[in-house]
Amino acid sequence: MEYEPVIGLEVHAQLLTESKIFCGCSTKFGAAPNSHTCPVCLGMPGVLPVLNKKVVEFGMKMALATHCRINEECSFARKNYFYPDLPKGYQISQYAYPLAEFGYVDIEVEDGKKRIGLTRIHMEEDAGKLIHDPHNPSSYVDLNRTGVPLIEIVSEPDMRSAEEAAAYLRRLHEILVYLEICDGNMEEGSFRCDANVSLRPRGESEFGTRTELKNMNSFRNVQRALEYEIKRQQYILEGGGSVVQETRLWDDSQGVTHPMRSKEEAHDYRYFPDPDLVAVKISADWVEAVLREQPELPLEKRERFVRDYGIPPYDAGVLSSSRPLADYYEEVARQSGNPKAASNWVMGDLLRFLNEEKREIRDCPISAASLGELIRLIDQGTISGKMAKEIIEEMYRTGKTAPAVVEEKGMVQITDEAALSGVITGILEANPNQLAQYRSGRDKLFGYFVGQVMKATRGKANPQVINDLLKKMLAG
């Protein structure tokens, strides 16, 4: 029997607000343990939470970017469970009345695009962090993360392979980072994913028993964990067994999943409305104000780059992979007036330099205006492409502009026809045998004469001018 995987993802994105969702404590990562806490996020008696407006607006940004319906009214609920990193004994989340519902994102698959539905986007607070001591049985609790704002993005079970799930996750990550509402750092836990996966006979509409996968801290691990879990469930079903509904942890070092606990249902958490927080009313004017601040999203930008700049889809995908890189490329294209050359130089030499030093485009020592100026010098014939390779290295190393490097190194290309004619005449007179052979039909010697001219001018002669003059002068 052939089985079909059914996959849904729950993504938690930590929002880039300066303060927590219900108090004024800092959200900055890496501070001393328990230094960013107060009576509100520690769950002390007699204190009341106050909702951070920016959290709602960041959630609305993601909802708009993923074509969700933003509800006119949403409210918070208490999710009750015990864990050492949850000081109140409950987590403030949303349940019956989330921020937004019924959205979608499109992903690229082998045969085109596929639409993945979003069930909901809701706001909630993060829990603290347990730190386990490897040298003794103690565990320590750091509550700095308690109350840090999250949005949870819940997909429909629309994915049918681990590859589709990884593509969907990358698309969400790309949108969140483009919107500048989440830094997307999976290692620090600001972008986390849980996966629900089940198998069913191909062609059936009823879902199988699902397992939830946790502890996946990279796109690669999400794909590997799902691939393993699909094979594990298939082995069980083909052997006549039954899949147990449970939560499993991914073990990256062994490449397997391990049972963690039985899978909870919503009723296990005893959700009820939080009496300390009023409902949030979202007006059409508020939605419109947030919409006006939305940037162009990566998929739209990619399509525009192909359409308006005439660059290949692959190049457009690389150049729009991050908002700062896309902005840099567009400025180079504007400054140079040559979008295709701008694409080649940014994707080629510039990204190579940055990748070698593990630097971001924001830290690039060559400004977009300077790179555009370099491309203009090539297009004007002032320097050759070969010269430009040497010049851009010097620009990257020193931060100097292209004209400054050209002047300093005396690298201006020779385009004066009279001067080059004199050089060519001397070379032809010094090579009578090669000249005679060329004129008798050995056309390949043309390259020899080009090389001699470049050697005589130390590579400064304009190749196009040389070619034109040589053709005339060799013809006799």
From Swiss-Prot:
GO terms for biological process: glutaminyl-tRNAGln biosynthesis via transamidation; translation. It is an enzyme of class 6 (ligase). Allows the formation of correctly charged Asn-tRNA(Asn) or Gln-tRNA(Gln) through the transamidation of misacylated Asp-tRNA(Asn) or Glu-tRNA(Gln) in organisms which lack either or both of asparaginyl-tRNA or glutaminyl-tRNA synthetases. The reaction takes place in the presence of glutamine and ATP through an activated phospho-Asp-tRNA(Asn) or phospho-Glu-tRNA(Gln). NCBIfam families: gatB, PRK05477.1-2, PRK05477.1-4, PRK05477.1-5. HAMAP family: GatB. Belongs to the GatB/GatE family. GatB subfamily. This is Aspartyl/glutamyl-tRNA(Asn/Gln) amidotransferase subunit B 2. It comes from Syntrophus aciditrophicus (strain SB).
